């Protein structure tokens, strides 16, 4: 197994990813936080948004990724509540990236399982700056990766490749006509939770607050499941070492959680449904992949 990648290849991949992300970062909301009228994607009627118009007036990214997903949301919303339509399309988008999710999850779980062993190797050569020691440490780490069939760089690639779908579903869920004008249990899909909580708390704002709390709980659970599964397969002494290693991971987890909650209160309510469903699907996928691919190895 070869883990050596030239700096040139890494730079090219990084540049490609940045360009792709920037291509998808089209401004779709006004100063009030609501979707701009010209950015709404309509399924039919006088305002019907065609694939050609999307490609011509916006970008290839919007035409290839955003438009199909938004129209799927609109299509399903004809036969079910818009919230259920968002849930269904979110699940479908997860299925599209499932092969990559399996690869990334398996590799990540293995990395967490061997983290205590990696820490031992690094501690063994701590303070040794000579070239021979560095090469010896790299070789020991390489042998460990090979033993558990881990390719760290492939894990990074598998994590980044689904990004276009994530950005596309992010926009599609907000821009679909059925979402902009839809409701679920009196919750307006285009409403900003923070606005509703601060101005209409006693009438409807409390419902948005409950939605945000549910979002926070599901996101937290989804982020902690991989750590729990990885530690479950460790020996007792390895668990102690893993707890130390997880301190930094926990800091990132809590930072990410706070960021998502903060973003959810200032974005259309439809995004909260998307994040809740994504978190639940992610947690279920992680558990199933662990049982099917990791535990059986």
What are these regions (language model features)?
Residues 2-297:
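Helix-loop-helix
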């Amino acid at each position: 197994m070869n883990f050596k990648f030239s700096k040139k290849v890494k730079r090219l991949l990084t540049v490609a990813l940045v360009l792709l992300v920037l291509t998808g970062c089209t401004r779709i909301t006004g100063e009030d936080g609501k979707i701009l009228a010209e950015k709404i994607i309509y399924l039919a009627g006088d305002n019907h948004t065609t694939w050609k118009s999307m490609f011509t007036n916006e970008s290839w990214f919007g035409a290839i990724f955003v438009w199909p997903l938004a129209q799927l949301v609109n299509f399903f919303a004809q036969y079910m509540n818009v919230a259920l339509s968002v849930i269904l399309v979110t699940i479908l988008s997860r299925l599209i990236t499932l092969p990559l999710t399996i690869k990334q999850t398996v590799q990540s779980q293995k990395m967490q399982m061997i983290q205590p062993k990696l820490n031992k190797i690094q501690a063994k050569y701590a303070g040794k700056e000579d070239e021979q020691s560095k090469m010896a440490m790299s070789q020991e780490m390489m042998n460990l990766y090979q033993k558990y069939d881990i390719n760290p760089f492939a894990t990074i690639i598998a994590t980044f490749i689904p990004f276009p779908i994530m950005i596309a579903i992010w926009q599609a869920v907000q821009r679909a006509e059925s979402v902009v004008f839809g409701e679920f249990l009196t919750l307006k899909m285009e409403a900003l939770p923070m606005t509703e909580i601060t101005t209409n708390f006693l009438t409807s704002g409390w419902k948005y607050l409950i939605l945000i709390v549910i979002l926070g709980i599901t996101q937290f659970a989804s982020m902690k499941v991989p750590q729990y599964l990885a530690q479950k397969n460790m020996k007792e002494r390895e668990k102690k070492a893993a707890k130390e290693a997880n301190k930094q991971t926990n800091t990132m987890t809590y930072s990410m959680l706070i960021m998502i909650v903060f973003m959810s209160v200032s974005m259309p309510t439809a995004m909260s449904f998307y994040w809740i469903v994504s978190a639940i699907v992610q947690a279920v996928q992680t558990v199933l992949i662990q049982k099917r691919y990791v535990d059986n190895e």
